[in-house]
């Protein structure tokens, strides 16, 4: 699982869990087909849709030199009904 970095936990990503959509940051060089293959193989789920967007890096200053952090990609992965990713499953009360 070299392409998937980590799951994202924000207000929007928590709302998307109710729609069976999972959000994670991935390597910027990974393709959609690679990510889909990794998710289906590693978690044993069926992916029906994937949305992605590129987030810009942040500016960093070290005295007179202005640098920046690397940009990254975020994927929103929609699973077929009945499938879920166990570590991110919402607890029902």
From Swiss-Prot:
Pfam families: Ribosomal_L23 (PF00276). Gene3D superfamilies: 3.30.70.330. InterPro entries: Nucleotide-bd_a/b_plait_sf (IPR012677), Ribosomal_uL23-like (IPR013025), Ribosomal_uL23/eL15/eS24_sf (IPR012678), Ribosomal_uL23_CS (IPR001014). It comes from Populus alba (White poplar). One of its GO terms (biological process) is translation. This is Large ribosomal subunit protein uL23cz/uL23cy. Keywords: Chloroplast, Plastid, Ribonucleoprotein, Ribosomal protein, RNA-binding, rRNA-binding. Disulfide bonds: none annotated.
């Amino acid at each position: 699982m070299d392409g998937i970095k980590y799951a994202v936990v924000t207000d929007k990503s928590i709302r998307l869990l109710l729609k069976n959509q999972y959000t994670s940051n991935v390597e910027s060089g990974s393709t959609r087909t690679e990510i889909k293959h990794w998710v289906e193989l590693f978690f044993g789920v069926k992916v029906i849709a994937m949305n992605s967007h590129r987030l810009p890096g942040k500016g960093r200053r070290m005295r007179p030199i202005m640098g920046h952090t690397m940009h990254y990609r975020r994927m929103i992965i929609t699973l077929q009904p009945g499938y879920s990713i166990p570590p991110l499953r919402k607890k029902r009360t």
